[in-house]
Amino acid sequence: MARIRLGKVVRAVGLKGHLGVAGSEGALATVRRIALRREGEPEPPLQEVLEARPQGRLWAVRIEGVSDRTSAEAWVGAEVLALREDLPEAGEARHYWADLEGLPVVTVAGAAIGTVTGLYETGGVDVLVVTTEEGGEKLVPLAPYVEVDVAGRRVVVDPPEGLLD
């Protein structure tokens, strides 16, 4: 059962054990089970989502087993995962991060830039980490000049001057 990364716990919210999750792109509104994974840990068990609501730029998520602020703070830094089959389809112009990793990145002229090897959450515009064929890295913001073609299995960039230098 494939697990998809929905985001990361960045802080505790309130006093009742809500986790402040960044990067979920709204998937937490519908998913009923998530897993929290700290770096270096094996696959964690799924936990029931008791409540999920938007909280500014974050999602405030309450799960079984986390009932106060102290226990929520213990999860700061953990990845939030869900089973692929528990998630709705991403829809047009939407995507899950796991759908992007491994995709080739090309310019609108068809020139190869590299392969998506990671993503950064910046709080505003997420940034693709693109590893070039030479082994270098390019950071490409998911801005209007980037088209994610999940069906075509590629990312197309119309880079502004200087982006790829």
From Swiss-Prot:
GO terms for cellular component: cytoplasm; ribosome. It comes from the Bacteria. It is found in: Cytoplasm. Residues 92-163 form the PRC barrel domain. The keyword Transmembrane helix does not apply. Coiled coil: none annotated. GO terms for biological process: ribosomal small subunit biogenesis; rRNA processing. GO terms for molecular function: ribosome binding. The keyword Membrane does not apply. InterPro entries: PRC_barrel-like_sf, PRC_RimM, RimM, RimM_N, RimM_N_sf. Keywords: Chaperone, Cytoplasm, Ribosome biogenesis, rRNA processing. Pfam families: PRC_RimM, RimM. Belongs to the RimM family. Binds ribosomal protein uS19. The PRC barrel domain binds ribosomal protein uS19. An accessory protein needed during the final step in the assembly of 30S ribosomal subunit, possibly for assembly of the head region. Essential for efficient processing of 16S rRNA. May be needed both before and after RbfA during the maturation of 16S rRNA. It has affinity for free ribosomal 30S subunits but not for 70S ribosomes. This is Ribosome maturation factor RimM. It comes from Anaeromyxobacter sp. (strain Fw109-5).
